[in-house]
Amino acid sequence: MNPNQKIITIGSVSLTIATICFLMQIAILVTTVTLHFKQYECSSPPNNQVIPCQPTIIERNITEIVYLTNTTIEKEICPKLVEYRNWSKPQCKITGFAPFSKDNSIRLSAGGDIWVTREPYVSCDPGKCYQFALGQGTTLNNRHSNDTVHDRTPYRTLLMNELGVPFHLGTKQVCIAWSSSSCHDGKAWLHVCVTGHDENATASFIYDGRLVDSIGSWSKNILRTQESECVCINGTCTVVMTDGSASERADTKILFIEEGKVVHISPLSGSAQHVEECSCYPRYPGVRCVCRDNWKGSNRPIVDINVKDYSIVSSYVCSGLVGDTPRKNDSSSSSYCQNPNNEKGSHGVKGWAFDDGNDVWMGRTISEELRSGYETFKVIGGWSTPNSKLQINRQVIVDSGNRSGYSGIFSVEGKSCINRCFYVELIRGRKQETKVWWTSNSIVVFCGTSGTYGTGSWPDGADINLMPI
């Protein structure tokens, strides 16, 4: 090859390489510009409209890094939108309840480090359910568990685990509390945590892991709250709190909270005479609660909360098959919707019920005097007809020979409807079982079903003779 041919060949190769590099730079430039404009757009599947990401509140910010030669291109994927829950779907139509979860905490305590607890409840965020309880600052196989029958100490804290995970040593202590309520507004968790002296307690309002607000005791007599989930609609969360006598008139208030800040307080109004430990559920556009009258009635009070104008209406469940313990036998018990029945009203237990048209679903202890056994059933006309007593779809959850305790409701939003679920506290130890010095619990959880179901009994199941003393 002569010198001229070499020069021509080298020039051709150089020109080809230069052309390729030029085309690559154009491709990189086009890609960069395209991704720059697309990082702020999300395609909306239903109608292919373009929705800007920036003005919305996002849950997570995911960035992918793509390397092309020496050029770095950042592409931001539009994240999942996070919105306040509004609970506007209808209530699911159910035929009864099916088993959902059981934590077996007491049985596991025989050979492991499990917290001593009471006052459990369940609540769900949009994607997952969690179990809560008030811990006693000790595990069961620890001498500090002696005398944990007492409700209020400075060592009690609110525990939170994924539903079905017992409260082990790695459990998160959400706040200091001997009375509590928790709920998720669609964006973050709100925890209402009461602690302090009986005559001057403090309620702390913790939102998204930060203390946002607080309120002190207004009647100087054991400020207390629901011991089950609160409810949030369109960013406004409601919680029922009582301060005052447990056996005479007390001062109940309904607090309205937005992102942890108390924005309004309404006094209880209506015909309810005594209200404690409410079990609340969303009933769009408001919130409905079924509570405990510890003074006059073994029929349960109802508190209806209007989230928009902060108004409150209260009454009593109409069903003549009443839900509290102690109570009269079913043949002689009564309820006429508006007032306490003055039947074994003193004392009581936390419980639940919810309306289904004119009917009512409810749960209660099987024993009329003790926290033993647990049953659920539907009362035809039990929400609207005074002293209605036609019972259908009865189920035994815990047989009458085994202990139960508090129970409460929680709601789960499905694709087309809102399902109602409940938990039952299964208390073990003192005061009834004096062979041991501790008092603690496990839980069992059921949810509404439109299908068929069988029978059974789901007690705590721990052999007290095998337990640490």
Curated annotation (Swiss-Prot):
<feature type="glycosylation site" description="N-linked (GlcNAc...) asparagine; by host">
    <location>
        <position position="200"/>
    </location>
</feature>
<comment type="similarity">
    <text>Belongs to the glycosyl hydrolase 34 family.</text>
</comment>
<dbReference type="GO" id="GO:0046761">
    <property type="term" value="P:viral budding from plasma membrane"/>
</dbReference>
<dbReference type="GO" id="GO:0004308">
    <property type="term" value="F:exo-alpha-sialidase activity"/>
</dbReference>
<feature type="glycosylation site" description="N-linked (GlcNAc...) asparagine; by host">
    <location>
        <position position="146"/>
    </location>
</feature>
<dbReference type="Pfam" id="PF00064">
    <property type="entry name" value="Neur"/>
</dbReference>
<dbReference type="GO" id="GO:0005975">
    <property type="term" value="P:carbohydrate metabolic process"/>
</dbReference>
<feature type="disulfide bond">
    <location>
        <begin position="183"/>
        <end position="230"/>
    </location>
</feature>
<feature type="disulfide bond">
    <location>
        <begin position="124"/>
        <end position="129"/>
    </location>
</feature>
<keyword id="KW-0472">Membrane</keyword>
<feature type="compositionally biased region" description="Polar residues">
    <location>
        <begin position="331"/>
        <end position="343"/>
    </location>
</feature>
<keyword id="KW-0479">Metal-binding</keyword>
<feature type="disulfide bond">
    <location>
        <begin position="318"/>
        <end position="337"/>
    </location>
</feature>
<feature type="active site" description="Nucleophile">
    <location>
        <position position="406"/>
    </location>
</feature>
<feature type="binding site">
    <location>
        <position position="118"/>
    </location>
    <ligand>
        <name>substrate</name>
    </ligand>
</feature>
<feature type="glycosylation site" description="N-linked (GlcNAc...) asparagine; by host">
    <location>
        <position position="234"/>
    </location>
</feature>
<feature type="binding site">
    <location>
        <position position="371"/>
    </location>
    <ligand>
        <name>substrate</name>
    </ligand>
</feature>
<dbReference type="InterPro" id="IPR033654">
    <property type="entry name" value="Sialidase_Influenza_A/B"/>
</dbReference>
<dbReference type="GO" id="GO:0020002">
    <property type="term" value="C:host cell plasma membrane"/>
</dbReference>
<comment type="subunit">
    <text>Homotetramer.</text>
</comment>
<dbReference type="GO" id="GO:0055036">
    <property type="term" value="C:virion membrane"/>
</dbReference>
<keyword id="KW-0735">Signal-anchor</keyword>
<dbReference type="InterPro" id="IPR036278">
    <property type="entry name" value="Sialidase_sf"/>
</dbReference>
<keyword id="KW-0325">Glycoprotein</keyword>
<keyword id="KW-1032">Host cell membrane</keyword>
<feature type="region of interest" description="Head of neuraminidase">
    <location>
        <begin position="91"/>
        <end position="469"/>
    </location>
</feature>
<feature type="region of interest" description="Hypervariable stalk region">
    <location>
        <begin position="36"/>
        <end position="88"/>
    </location>
</feature>
<feature type="glycosylation site" description="N-linked (GlcNAc...) asparagine; by host">
    <location>
        <position position="86"/>
    </location>
</feature>
<keyword id="KW-1133">Transmembrane helix</keyword>
<feature type="binding site">
    <location>
        <position position="293"/>
    </location>
    <ligand>
        <name>Ca(2+)</name>
    </ligand>
</feature>
<feature type="disulfide bond">
    <location>
        <begin position="92"/>
        <end position="417"/>
    </location>
</feature>
<feature type="glycosylation site" description="N-linked (GlcNAc...) asparagine; by host">
    <location>
        <position position="61"/>
    </location>
</feature>
<comment type="function">
    <text>Catalyzes the removal of terminal sialic acid residues from viral and cellular glycoconjugates. Cleaves off the terminal sialic acids on the glycosylated HA during virus budding to facilitate virus release. Additionally helps virus spread through the circulation by further removing sialic acids from the cell surface. These cleavages prevent self-aggregation and ensure the efficient spread of the progeny virus from cell to cell. Otherwise, infection would be limited to one round of replication.</text>
</comment>
<feature type="disulfide bond">
    <location>
        <begin position="421"/>
        <end position="447"/>
    </location>
</feature>
<feature type="region of interest" description="Involved in apical transport and lipid raft association">
    <location>
        <begin position="11"/>
        <end position="33"/>
    </location>
</feature>
<feature type="disulfide bond">
    <location>
        <begin position="280"/>
        <end position="289"/>
    </location>
</feature>
<feature type="binding site">
    <location>
        <begin position="276"/>
        <end position="277"/>
    </location>
    <ligand>
        <name>substrate</name>
    </ligand>
</feature>
<feature type="binding site">
    <location>
        <position position="297"/>
    </location>
    <ligand>
        <name>Ca(2+)</name>
    </ligand>
</feature>
<feature type="topological domain" description="Intravirion">
    <location>
        <begin position="1"/>
        <end position="9"/>
    </location>
</feature>
<feature type="binding site">
    <location>
        <position position="152"/>
    </location>
    <ligand>
        <name>substrate</name>
    </ligand>
</feature>
<dbReference type="GO" id="GO:0046872">
    <property type="term" value="F:metal ion binding"/>
</dbReference>
<feature type="binding site">
    <location>
        <position position="324"/>
    </location>
    <ligand>
        <name>Ca(2+)</name>
    </ligand>
</feature>
